[in-house]
Amino acid sequence: MSFTPGKQSSSRASSGNRSGNGILKWADQSDQSRNVQTRGRRAQPKQTATSQQPSGGNVVPYYSWFSGITQFQKGKEFEFAEGQGVPIAPGVPATEAKGYWYRHNRRSFKTADGNQRQLLPRWYFYYLGTGPHAKDQYGTDIDGVFWVASNQADVNTPADILDRDPSSDEAIPTRFPPGTVLPQGYYIEGSGRSAPNSRSTSRASSRASSAGSRSRANSGNRTPTSGVTPDMADQIASLVLAKLGKDATKPQQVTKQTAKEIRQKILNKPRQKRSPNKQCTVQQCFGKRGPNQNFGGGEMLKLGTSDPQFPILAELAPTAGAFFFGSRLELAKVQNLSGNLDEPQKDVYELRYNGAIRFDSTLSGFETIMKVLNENLNAYQQQDGMMNMSPKPQRQRGQKNGQGENDNISVAAPKSRVQQNKSRELTAEDISLLKKMDEPYTEDTSEI
């Protein structure tokens, strides 16, 4: 007598639609209206349009009785301990609990940023003697197949289990006996979260409800999910990650401490590997402008490669091959001026080069390039000329325009000649007054 998962052994599979206890229809194994041709064991697989996987991925023409287990961490092996790994199915005795997990390589899709993302594989369980490897013996070394069986099962004979017809039988949420250790980096579809290494049956079944239902696995009726695609969760996760990645590239506020760290990091690099920016200016990286370093002026000296005009100039920069093979090179030993005298001296060499970059008016952005070059070539000469010009005479505090020549005249009128701080010769009248001040004072007693 053949057994039907999800039903008691005394009952036979019906040809009509059903919604039994603990049964859930999954979107990756949606039912299609079709005629039932056979109900016997090892029936010919029935392919449907939903079993075809576009955009890559292998075809799964067989419908598993259970929901899949999806990988969410790369590099994790799918494996169970001996005697574990067979899902619980009402109506299936322990002697028939034997089969294999089949790896389904899913398709890739385009993310929000335009890149192709390969979905991690999903594993489905098939009873021994059914599914894509129905003719293979238990334990055969097959890539993408992991064999499992209970301790009571005889793996030398196929399981007496019917194939699932999605038009009448719905997929069962995957549950395991207590003590089953799930593979690391995998989660059970429909559980709503990644599965830890050890999970009891009650906890696994409590998270096997559909997205729109709060009922538990022991409820009488469960509403089938609808409007859900098998890879919707992965697509949503990828979109969220892409969004986070985009937001993460937004410019962050740079503090004095971080600016100092960035500057020091740039200066620790060899001179020919430095890229000046806002935190480490051109002068800090390469020194002041002069005859030997004659490019840069104005904002470009402050912003360096962060200047909006710099990218168009970078198009003119030679490649490494053009630098070495298209230039005149000369190796010269120079004096080491760095380090203390008590430190061991190092031999310092300069690879001097002389070359040219040729371009014409047909170059894209030619006018802009010429404008930027004219503004920055030998710009230090104009800056030095402006600094060497005689500064405009500044008027003193409290001095009005037009009174610059009268340096000794105060704006406010002095109260006395002493405040003017000016010297002059004594007149005869002054001498007469001084003599009278020296004479003794006598009271005038004459009558008027």
From Swiss-Prot:
Where is the stretch described as RNA-binding? 52-194
Q: Does the keyword Cytoplasm apply?
A: no
Question: Where is the sequence biased in composition, kind Low complexity?
Answer: 9-22, 193-223
Please state every residue range assigned to the domain named CoV N CTD: 259-384
Q: How is it modified after translation?
A: ADP-ribosylated. The ADP-ribosylation is retained in the virion during infection.
Q: Which annotated residues bind RNA?
A: 106, 122, 164
Sequence ranges assigned to domain CoV N NTD in this UniProt record: 61-190
Q: Where is this region: Disordered?
A: 1-55, 157-231, 266-297, 385-448
Record field: compositional bias (Basic and acidic residues): 422-439
Stretches with biased composition (Basic residues): 266-276
Q: Write out the entry's keywords from A to Z.
A: ADP-ribosylation, Host Golgi apparatus, Phosphoprotein, Ribonucleoprotein, RNA-binding, Transcription, Transcription regulation, Viral nucleoprotein, Virion
Q: Which residues carry this modification: Phosphothreonine?
A: 174, 427
The UniProt regions of compositional bias labelled Polar residues, in chain numbering, are: 29-38, 45-55, 399-409
HAMAP family noted in UniProt: BETA_CORONA_NCAP
- Function description: Packages the positive strand viral genome RNA into a helical ribonucleocapsid (RNP) and plays a fundamental role during virion assembly through its interactions with the viral genome and membrane protein M. Plays an important role in enhancing the efficiency of subgenomic viral RNA transcription as well as viral replication.
State the similarity comment: Belongs to the betacoronavirus nucleocapsid protein family.
Subunit (UniProt): Homooligomer. Both monomeric and oligomeric forms interact with RNA. Interacts with protein M. Interacts with NSP3; this interaction serves to tether the genome to the newly translated replicase-transcriptase complex at a very early stage of infection.
Q: What is this protein called?
A: Nucleoprotein
Its gene name is N
